Amino acid sequence: MPSSISLENLESYMPNRSSFRMNFETKSINDFSNYAEEFDKEGAKCFVDSDNVSAKIIFDIGTEALPEHQRNTAKLRLDKTAAFSRLLSVNGERFNQKEAANFIEDWGDFIVVSTSSAEAMTIAQAANAITKLTIESARSLTSEMDDFSEHMSAMERVEVKNKDKMPSNIDFTCVPYGGLDERKFQIKLSVLTGGDKPQVSLRIVKLEQHKEDIIEEFKEILVGKFEKSELKTFIGTC
């Protein structure tokens, strides 16, 4: 074919499209399932993206004998809630005493705090205990570690001293993504004493397991929404 000649799609000049196709996007599980119910057809599949807590339906996959163009789709992407976003932002981070106390106070409606012996603390007690932390250093040959003291195997012994009981565990309960159930996350609070002033480290316990459970819950919700149709749901992308 000569280079001066090009092929053009004449669909725009036709009274109708050559095939039905839409790219519907939403953040609502109910709207996603309602749309899927209306446009469901033979061969359609739903794929759940475990990395982004999202789902995509391809309606015009067709069959092995009669494959279609895969241009008619619906996408669902769930947003993280503000509480869950904040929770993830503190995981593995180090904070000074004021920052750690502020986190506990600011998100007190979502938090239950306890000591290492499982004794409950109020939000005010926990924040106050953190802000009053002090460090004493001494020379020692001993080596020992617990929740709130670290004795180096070298010569220095550093201990956290505080007259109040210290918070050790934080239960942070929130809805992680819009449309999912409330979930409890356990945060382990550790005091780091390597410098002149103590730092507080927060770590979410079994975070990866929580992420897997969230995806399974998401998939189960979609499967339940599609139970009246033949639409199959898979974890993966396409």
Where are the regions a protein language model picked out?
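An N-terminally focused, membrane-permeabilizing/fusogenic/translocator signature enriched
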Residues: M1-E68, S229-C238
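Intrinsically disordered, low-complexity segments used for protein-protein interactions
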Residues: S3, E37, A55-F59, N102-D109, ...
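Intrinsic-disorder-associated interaction segments
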Residues: S3, S18-I29, R77, E93-Q97, ...
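Generic detector of well-ordered alpha-helical segments enriched in charged/polar residues
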Residues: E11, N30-S33, E37, I58, ...
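Surface-exposed polar/charged interaction patches
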Residues: N16, F20, Y35-K45, E64, ...
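Amphipathic, membrane-inserting segments
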Residues: V48-D51, I57-F84, S149-C238
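Short N-terminal edge-element motif at the start of the domain
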Residues: F84-N96
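Membrane-inserting effector segments that mediate pore formation, membrane fusion
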Residues: F95-S149
